[in-house]
Amino acid sequence: MDDTKRPLYLPFAGPAILEAPLINKGSAFSEEERIFFNLEGLLPYVIETIEEQAARAYAQFSNFSNDLDKHIYLRNIQDTNETLFYRLVRNNITEMMPIIYTPTVGLACERFSKNYRRNRGLFISYSNKDRIDDILNNSTRHKVKVIVVTDGERILGLGDQGIGGMGIPIGKLSLYTSCGGISPAYTLPITLDVGTDNQELLDDPMYMGWRHRRIEGQDYADFVEAFMEAVHRRWPDVLIQFEDFAQRNAMPLLERYKDQYCCFNDDIQGTAAVTVGSLLAASKAANTQLSKQRVVFLGAGSAGCGIAEAIVAQMISEGISEAQARSQVFMVDRLGLLQDNTANLLPFQQKLAQSSATVSQWHIEGDSVSLLNVINNAKPTVLIGVSGSPGQFTEAVIRAMHLHCPRPIVFPLSNPTSRVEATPEDVLNWTNGQALVATGSPFEPVTIGDETFEIAQCNNSFIFPGIGLGVLACRAKRVSDEMLMASSRALAECSPLGTTRTGSLLPKLDDIQKVSKYIAFAVAKVAMAQGLALPLTDELLNKSIEKNFWEPKYRRYKRTSF
């Protein structure tokens, strides 16, 4: 049944309704509602539809000249009338997604304290570590089903932003709703304020976080443990997404909790899933398989290694051995190629290190096995950037790759735009329009000669909303590796280029809600097959997906007793 057709009974009236963003309708309150809820005189005379409100809001939005001001404007609507906010974003998803999330959200995080206006979500400070249960009970959202949590240490490619990192959970949950149909009433952004090592923030009199160096080691681990246990007590079935934790914490936290709670790390697993899905589509478009590709990474942190492990798993599923799959994946960091004799490798890097005996037979120019050396010797067909270092895919690197690969796949994925390893225009110019390009941030189409290329945005928003919707639809208890792999394959099946050999590598953002539902179905099917969710027929699963897919429409309100 469509919930928008049923009335919602409210026990309060007057200005309190206008101050509640989840139920405020603004000028759309009917005459009857204005009388019953003591709103007469508090609103202008005209009663508008949500589309009329959205048209005015879009006109106001268009008057702003820079993206940060547009972001602030949209956040203000979100904080006053969430239904209108999501109608506006749904109507203009391609234009507004870069404003509410990457790349603009990075600037919003940097200026979070200076631009702070109104509370949203929860800030849990280390100094309040003994009162986490009380803080969770203070939330204005009571039926929470999805949490995005960060500690603000590795915000996009911008580093430690302290509590300014709250912009990321807010933005991510906005996409859970805009793209995946998760009701905003069921979402909660959380920042774990464990201090900051950003001296600029510590010295800033406007900084609103806990002025303390970051808590580390066992104190940090105990704090996160207390948080996870408290969340589980408050909302036992909630889905928790870890977001923008530093490399040294991201993988250990994921390994510790992924089999204990329903959780995943979007930087590691979501990025891996969307990248593998994009690579599957690109491989299909080139009439080959992922297992036949040779892949070079620039960036060997938790995100890069997470993608690499997902690629290895997909290659193995296509029939090659694990040893063969790992021999086709090359990880390069700022010191050069990761090898089995490289000092101080992190545990998650060790299995991805190349054999030094093999590398010793290469022709190396210079003192280290640089990215260009790897390109010249490994002769890759795929190049992926997750380094956060702009301009690293130089003309020499791209031309060297194109020299031995007629149709190279190049994914400069670092966010925000200022951190991208190469622009799509440069990559396409250096390969005479032959490269298959996808980026982490949005870019305008590129014209080479008479041909215009749509630039696919290899953005996690194609994956995590569908995962969330699938988890809610089947009430999954965990997020397994197999569920994530299913999301990759489902995304590849939605690729225009992969299915028709024409168009973009990834679907248009206008189709993202359909894609999310398709991914949700695939994810839920695997969860049920693994015994991690309620057993449902395909018909019941589709009904559950539709039931859980919230639409930004106003409901009728009726008065109940105080």
From Swiss-Prot:
Cofactor note: Divalent metal cations. Prefers magnesium or manganese.
Alphabetical list of InterPro entries matching this protein: Aminoacid_DH-like_N_sf, Malic_enzyme_CS, Malic_N_dom, Malic_N_dom_sf, Malic_NAD-bd, Malic_OxRdtase, NAD(P)-bd_dom_sf, NAD_malic_enz_proteobac
Top EC class, one word: oxidoreductase
Residues binding a divalent metal cation: 243-244, 267
Pfam families: malic, Malic_M
GO molecular function: malate dehydrogenase (decarboxylating) (NAD+) activity; metal ion binding; NAD binding; oxaloacetate decarboxylase activity
Organism superkingdom: Bacteria
Chain positions of site Important for activity: 267
Cystine residue pairs: none
Oligomer and partners: Homotetramer.
Name of this chain's protein: NAD-dependent malic enzyme
Taxon lineage: Bacteria, Pseudomonadati, Pseudomonadota, Gammaproteobacteria, Alteromonadales
Gene coding for it: maeA
